[in-house]
Design a protein with these regions (language model features):
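Residues at the C-termini of beta-strands that transition into short coil/loop
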Residues: 101, 199, 251
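Small/polar loops that bind or transfer phosphate-bearing groups
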Residues: 176, 228-229
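A mid-sequence, solvent-exposed acidic-amphipathic segment
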Residues: 179-186, 190-222
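Residues at the starts of beta-strands that form the adenosine-phosphate
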Residues: 171, 194, 246
Length: 319
Protein backbone atom coordinates (compact mmCIF):
# COMPACT_ATOMS: atom_id res chain seq x y z
CA UNK A 1 0.00 0.00 0.00
CA UNK A 2 2.87 2.42 0.86
CA UNK A 3 4.57 1.63 -2.47
CA UNK A 4 1.37 2.36 -4.41
CA UNK A 5 0.91 5.69 -2.62
CA UNK A 6 4.50 6.74 -3.33
CA UNK A 7 4.20 5.66 -6.97
CA UNK A 8 0.90 7.52 -7.44
CA UNK A 9 2.40 10.62 -5.83
CA UNK A 10 5.39 10.58 -8.19
CA UNK A 11 3.13 10.04 -11.21
CA UNK A 12 0.88 12.93 -10.16
CA UNK A 13 3.94 15.19 -9.79
CA UNK A 14 5.52 14.27 -13.14
CA UNK A 15 2.73 12.93 -15.40
CA UNK A 16 4.30 14.02 -18.70
CA UNK A 17 7.66 12.49 -17.86
CA UNK A 18 6.00 9.25 -16.72
CA UNK A 19 4.01 9.00 -19.96
CA UNK A 20 7.10 9.74 -22.06
CA UNK A 21 9.04 6.94 -20.37
CA UNK A 22 6.18 4.50 -20.98
CA UNK A 23 5.93 5.50 -24.65
CA UNK A 24 9.68 5.04 -25.15
CA UNK A 25 9.63 1.57 -23.59
CA UNK A 26 6.53 0.59 -25.56
CA UNK A 27 8.08 1.73 -28.85
CA UNK A 28 11.12 -0.42 -28.05
CA UNK A 29 8.95 -3.51 -27.55
CA UNK A 30 6.91 -2.81 -30.69
CA UNK A 31 10.06 -2.55 -32.81
CA UNK A 32 11.33 -5.84 -31.40
CA UNK A 33 8.63 -7.59 -33.43
CA UNK A 34 7.72 -9.97 -30.61
CA UNK A 35 4.03 -10.67 -30.03
CA UNK A 36 2.03 -12.97 -27.75
CA UNK A 37 0.61 -16.17 -29.24
CA UNK A 38 -3.17 -15.53 -29.26
CA UNK A 39 -5.74 -17.66 -31.07
CA UNK A 40 -8.39 -15.78 -33.04
CA UNK A 41 -12.09 -15.52 -32.20
CA UNK A 42 -13.20 -18.47 -34.34
CA UNK A 43 -10.47 -20.72 -32.94
CA UNK A 44 -11.43 -19.73 -29.40
CA UNK A 45 -15.11 -20.60 -29.81
CA UNK A 46 -14.32 -23.81 -31.69
CA UNK A 47 -11.89 -24.88 -28.97
CA UNK A 48 -14.56 -24.42 -26.31
CA UNK A 49 -17.04 -26.43 -28.38
CA UNK A 50 -14.56 -29.28 -28.83
CA UNK A 51 -13.15 -29.34 -25.30
CA UNK A 52 -14.88 -29.51 -21.91
CA UNK A 53 -12.83 -26.67 -20.44
CA UNK A 54 -13.31 -23.47 -18.48
CA UNK A 55 -12.33 -19.98 -19.59
CA UNK A 56 -11.07 -16.82 -17.88
CA UNK A 57 -10.62 -13.49 -19.66
CA UNK A 58 -8.17 -10.69 -18.96
CA UNK A 59 -9.04 -7.61 -21.00
CA UNK A 60 -7.70 -4.09 -20.70
CA UNK A 61 -9.60 -3.58 -17.43
CA UNK A 62 -7.89 -6.52 -15.72
CA UNK A 63 -4.49 -5.42 -17.00
CA UNK A 64 -5.05 -1.86 -15.80
CA UNK A 65 -5.60 -3.33 -12.33
CA UNK A 66 -2.40 -5.37 -12.68
CA UNK A 67 -0.55 -2.18 -13.67
CA UNK A 68 -1.71 -0.57 -10.42
CA UNK A 69 -4.68 1.36 -11.77
CA UNK A 70 -8.36 1.09 -10.94
CA UNK A 71 -11.62 0.50 -12.77
CA UNK A 72 -14.95 2.30 -12.35
CA UNK A 73 -16.62 -0.84 -10.98
CA UNK A 74 -13.65 -2.51 -9.26
CA UNK A 75 -11.28 -0.83 -6.82
CA UNK A 76 -7.61 -1.79 -6.72
CA UNK A 77 -6.96 -4.84 -4.55
CA UNK A 78 -3.56 -6.49 -4.00
CA UNK A 79 -5.04 -9.97 -3.61
CA UNK A 80 -7.02 -9.55 -6.82
CA UNK A 81 -3.91 -8.47 -8.73
CA UNK A 82 -1.97 -11.46 -7.37
CA UNK A 83 -4.77 -13.77 -8.55
CA UNK A 84 -4.92 -12.17 -12.01
CA UNK A 85 -1.18 -12.58 -12.53
CA UNK A 86 -1.40 -16.20 -11.34
CA UNK A 87 -4.17 -16.88 -13.86
CA UNK A 88 -2.24 -15.16 -16.65
CA UNK A 89 0.64 -17.61 -16.13
CA UNK A 90 -1.48 -20.67 -15.30
CA UNK A 91 -1.42 -23.90 -17.28
CA UNK A 92 -4.40 -26.04 -16.26
CA UNK A 93 -5.47 -28.76 -18.69
CA UNK A 94 -9.18 -27.92 -18.22
CA UNK A 95 -8.91 -24.14 -18.39
CA UNK A 96 -7.93 -21.57 -21.02
CA UNK A 97 -6.87 -17.96 -20.55
CA UNK A 98 -8.03 -15.24 -22.95
CA UNK A 99 -6.32 -11.91 -23.56
CA UNK A 100 -6.96 -9.20 -26.14
CA UNK A 101 -5.63 -9.96 -29.63
CA UNK A 102 -4.46 -6.40 -30.27
CA UNK A 103 -0.68 -6.62 -30.53
CA UNK A 104 -0.62 -7.04 -34.30
CA UNK A 105 -3.54 -7.01 -36.72
CA UNK A 106 -6.64 -4.99 -35.70
CA UNK A 107 -8.50 -5.77 -38.93
CA UNK A 108 -11.80 -7.04 -37.42
CA UNK A 109 -12.26 -4.05 -35.12
CA UNK A 110 -14.15 -0.87 -35.90
CA UNK A 111 -12.33 2.44 -36.28
CA UNK A 112 -13.18 3.69 -32.79
CA UNK A 113 -11.77 0.56 -31.16
CA UNK A 114 -8.68 0.56 -33.38
CA UNK A 115 -7.96 4.14 -32.32
CA UNK A 116 -8.37 3.24 -28.64
CA UNK A 117 -5.97 0.29 -28.78
CA UNK A 118 -3.32 2.10 -30.84
CA UNK A 119 -3.17 4.91 -28.29
CA UNK A 120 -3.45 2.53 -25.33
CA UNK A 121 -0.58 0.32 -26.54
CA UNK A 122 1.52 3.34 -27.47
CA UNK A 123 1.78 3.91 -23.73
CA UNK A 124 1.25 0.50 -22.15
CA UNK A 125 2.59 -2.14 -24.58
CA UNK A 126 5.76 -2.67 -22.55
CA UNK A 127 3.69 -3.25 -19.40
CA UNK A 128 1.59 -5.91 -21.13
CA UNK A 129 4.77 -7.62 -22.32
CA UNK A 130 6.16 -7.56 -18.80
CA UNK A 131 3.34 -9.81 -17.56
CA UNK A 132 2.32 -11.87 -20.61
CA UNK A 133 4.03 -15.25 -21.00
CA UNK A 134 5.42 -15.20 -24.55
CA UNK A 135 5.78 -19.00 -24.51
CA UNK A 136 2.11 -19.64 -23.66
CA UNK A 137 -0.81 -20.02 -26.07
CA UNK A 138 -3.63 -17.64 -25.16
CA UNK A 139 -7.16 -17.43 -26.49
CA UNK A 140 -9.17 -14.37 -27.47
CA UNK A 141 -11.20 -12.04 -25.23
CA UNK A 142 -12.93 -10.72 -28.36
CA UNK A 143 -14.74 -14.04 -28.71
CA UNK A 144 -17.34 -12.72 -26.24
CA UNK A 145 -17.44 -9.23 -27.78
CA UNK A 146 -19.59 -10.51 -30.60
CA UNK A 147 -21.08 -7.24 -31.92
CA UNK A 148 -20.00 -3.86 -30.50
CA UNK A 149 -16.33 -3.86 -31.53
CA UNK A 150 -16.76 -5.45 -34.97
CA UNK A 151 -16.36 -3.52 -38.21
CA UNK A 152 -18.29 -6.25 -40.07
CA UNK A 153 -21.47 -6.72 -38.02
CA UNK A 154 -22.59 -9.66 -40.18
CA UNK A 155 -20.09 -11.83 -38.28
CA UNK A 156 -22.19 -11.53 -35.12
CA UNK A 157 -25.10 -13.85 -36.01
CA UNK A 158 -23.09 -17.03 -36.76
CA UNK A 159 -20.94 -16.45 -33.68
CA UNK A 160 -23.94 -16.11 -31.39
CA UNK A 161 -25.32 -19.31 -32.91
CA UNK A 162 -22.09 -21.12 -32.04
CA UNK A 163 -22.06 -19.78 -28.50
CA UNK A 164 -25.61 -21.04 -27.95
CA UNK A 165 -24.46 -24.58 -28.70
CA UNK A 166 -22.35 -24.51 -25.54
CA UNK A 167 -25.34 -24.34 -23.20
CA UNK A 168 -27.95 -26.15 -25.28
CA UNK A 169 -29.92 -28.50 -22.98
CA UNK A 170 -27.54 -27.71 -20.11
CA UNK A 171 -28.35 -26.79 -16.52
CA UNK A 172 -26.66 -23.42 -16.25
CA UNK A 173 -25.83 -21.32 -13.22
CA UNK A 174 -25.12 -17.63 -13.67
CA UNK A 175 -22.76 -15.87 -11.31
CA UNK A 176 -23.53 -12.25 -12.10
CA UNK A 177 -23.87 -8.77 -10.68
CA UNK A 178 -27.02 -7.53 -9.01
CA UNK A 179 -28.19 -5.71 -12.13
CA UNK A 180 -26.63 -7.88 -14.87
CA UNK A 181 -29.73 -10.06 -15.41
CA UNK A 182 -28.34 -12.24 -18.18
CA UNK A 183 -30.96 -13.56 -20.58
CA UNK A 184 -33.81 -11.47 -19.17
CA UNK A 185 -35.74 -9.87 -22.04
CA UNK A 186 -34.03 -11.90 -24.76
CA UNK A 187 -33.68 -15.50 -25.95
CA UNK A 188 -29.89 -15.91 -25.75
CA UNK A 189 -30.15 -18.66 -23.12
CA UNK A 190 -33.62 -19.94 -23.99
CA UNK A 191 -32.18 -23.26 -25.20
CA UNK A 192 -30.74 -24.10 -21.76
CA UNK A 193 -32.51 -26.84 -19.79
CA UNK A 194 -32.61 -24.76 -16.61
CA UNK A 195 -31.26 -21.52 -15.18
CA UNK A 196 -30.18 -20.68 -11.65
CA UNK A 197 -28.53 -17.48 -10.45
CA UNK A 198 -25.96 -16.55 -7.83
CA UNK A 199 -26.01 -12.78 -7.38
CA UNK A 200 -22.95 -10.73 -6.44
CA UNK A 201 -22.43 -6.97 -6.14
CA UNK A 202 -22.60 -4.75 -9.21
CA UNK A 203 -19.36 -3.08 -8.07
CA UNK A 204 -16.28 -4.21 -6.10
CA UNK A 205 -17.44 -7.82 -6.26
CA UNK A 206 -13.99 -9.14 -5.35
CA UNK A 207 -14.69 -8.19 -1.73
CA UNK A 208 -17.04 -11.19 -1.68
CA UNK A 209 -15.35 -13.64 -4.04
CA UNK A 210 -14.77 -16.27 -1.34
CA UNK A 211 -18.42 -16.22 -0.26
CA UNK A 212 -19.53 -16.57 -3.89
CA UNK A 213 -17.12 -19.47 -4.42
CA UNK A 214 -18.46 -21.28 -1.34
CA UNK A 215 -22.01 -21.03 -2.70
CA UNK A 216 -20.95 -22.13 -6.17
CA UNK A 217 -19.27 -25.25 -4.79
CA UNK A 218 -22.65 -26.37 -3.40
CA UNK A 219 -23.84 -26.89 -6.99
CA UNK A 220 -23.58 -30.27 -8.72
CA UNK A 221 -20.55 -30.61 -10.99
CA UNK A 222 -22.65 -31.42 -14.05
CA UNK A 223 -23.89 -27.81 -14.13
CA UNK A 224 -22.35 -25.21 -16.43
CA UNK A 225 -21.34 -21.94 -14.77
CA UNK A 226 -21.57 -18.75 -16.83
CA UNK A 227 -20.05 -15.70 -15.21
CA UNK A 228 -20.43 -11.95 -15.74
CA UNK A 229 -18.85 -10.18 -12.78
CA UNK A 230 -15.87 -8.19 -14.03
CA UNK A 231 -12.41 -9.27 -12.80
CA UNK A 232 -14.06 -11.39 -10.10
CA UNK A 233 -15.46 -13.61 -12.86
CA UNK A 234 -11.90 -14.08 -14.14
CA UNK A 235 -10.88 -15.39 -10.73
CA UNK A 236 -13.97 -17.49 -10.02
CA UNK A 237 -13.82 -19.27 -13.39
CA UNK A 238 -10.24 -20.26 -12.64
CA UNK A 239 -10.99 -21.37 -9.08
CA UNK A 240 -14.05 -23.38 -10.15
CA UNK A 241 -12.05 -25.14 -12.87
CA UNK A 242 -9.57 -26.27 -10.20
CA UNK A 243 -12.52 -27.81 -8.33
CA UNK A 244 -13.63 -29.80 -11.38
CA UNK A 245 -16.41 -27.50 -12.61
CA UNK A 246 -16.83 -26.02 -16.05
CA UNK A 247 -17.04 -22.24 -15.77
CA UNK A 248 -17.10 -19.73 -18.61
CA UNK A 249 -16.29 -16.07 -18.00
CA UNK A 250 -18.49 -14.52 -20.70
CA UNK A 251 -18.61 -10.93 -19.48
CA UNK A 252 -20.59 -8.67 -21.79
CA UNK A 253 -22.04 -11.39 -24.01
CA UNK A 254 -25.64 -10.71 -22.93
CA UNK A 255 -25.27 -6.96 -23.56
CA UNK A 256 -23.62 -7.73 -26.90
CA UNK A 257 -26.68 -9.79 -27.81
CA UNK A 258 -29.02 -6.96 -26.77
CA UNK A 259 -27.07 -4.51 -28.93
CA UNK A 260 -27.09 -6.98 -31.80
CA UNK A 261 -30.88 -7.36 -31.60
CA UNK A 262 -31.32 -3.59 -31.54
CA UNK A 263 -28.58 -2.97 -34.14
CA UNK A 264 -27.15 -0.25 -31.91
CA UNK A 265 -24.27 -0.58 -29.44
CA UNK A 266 -24.39 2.94 -28.02
CA UNK A 267 -27.60 2.63 -26.04
CA UNK A 268 -28.44 1.79 -22.45
CA UNK A 269 -30.25 -1.54 -22.09
CA UNK A 270 -33.26 -0.96 -19.79
CA UNK A 271 -33.12 -3.04 -16.62
CA UNK A 272 -29.46 -3.99 -17.07
CA UNK A 273 -26.21 -2.51 -15.78
CA UNK A 274 -24.56 -1.10 -18.92
CA UNK A 275 -21.14 0.12 -17.79
CA UNK A 276 -19.87 1.15 -21.24
CA UNK A 277 -22.68 3.61 -21.98
CA UNK A 278 -23.33 6.92 -20.24
CA UNK A 279 -26.16 6.55 -17.72
CA UNK A 280 -25.92 2.77 -17.79
CA UNK A 281 -25.36 2.56 -14.03
CA UNK A 282 -28.87 3.86 -13.31
CA UNK A 283 -30.89 0.64 -13.30
CA UNK A 284 -34.48 0.14 -12.21
CA UNK A 285 -35.67 -2.79 -10.12
CA UNK A 286 -36.58 -6.05 -11.86
CA UNK A 287 -40.02 -7.41 -10.96
CA UNK A 288 -39.85 -10.38 -13.31
CA UNK A 289 -41.01 -13.39 -11.27
CA UNK A 290 -39.15 -15.86 -13.47
CA UNK A 291 -35.91 -13.99 -12.75
CA UNK A 292 -36.62 -13.79 -9.02
CA UNK A 293 -37.39 -17.50 -8.80
CA UNK A 294 -34.11 -18.36 -10.52
CA UNK A 295 -32.04 -16.69 -7.77
CA UNK A 296 -30.68 -19.33 -5.39
CA UNK A 297 -28.27 -17.02 -3.54
CA UNK A 298 -27.77 -13.27 -3.28
CA UNK A 299 -24.89 -11.62 -1.49
CA UNK A 300 -27.25 -8.71 -0.75
CA UNK A 301 -29.52 -10.96 1.28
CA UNK A 302 -26.53 -12.18 3.29
CA UNK A 303 -25.31 -8.62 3.84
CA UNK A 304 -28.78 -7.63 5.08
CA UNK A 305 -28.87 -10.64 7.42
CA UNK A 306 -25.44 -9.72 8.81
CA UNK A 307 -26.59 -6.15 9.45
CA UNK A 308 -29.66 -7.44 11.28
CA UNK A 309 -27.48 -9.70 13.44
CA UNK A 310 -25.30 -6.74 14.40
CA UNK A 311 -28.38 -4.68 15.24
CA UNK A 312 -29.73 -7.52 17.39
CA UNK A 313 -26.41 -7.90 19.17
CA UNK A 314 -26.19 -4.25 20.17
CA UNK A 315 -29.88 -3.47 20.63
CA UNK A 316 -31.01 -2.30 24.08
CA UNK A 317 -34.23 -3.85 25.32
CA UNK A 318 -36.27 -1.94 27.87
CA UNK A 319 -37.16 -3.65 31.15
Amino acid sequence: MIYEKIRDKIISMFPDMYKKINITLSERDKKSGKKPDIRNTEETIEYLLANECSMSRLGDGEFILIFGGRENYQKYDKELVKKLVEILHSNLSNHIVCISDVFGNLAERNDENKKYWKEHLRVYRHKYYKYIDMNKTYYNTSATRVYKLLENKSLAKPRFEKWRLLWENKDIVFIEGKETRMGIGNDLFSNARSIRRIIGPAENAFDYWKELLIEAKKIEKTALFILALGPTATVLSYELSKEGYRALDLGHIDLEYEWYLKQNSNIVIPGKYTNEVSGGNMVEECNDNVYKNEIIYSIYKEMKNDCNKIKDKYSITSI
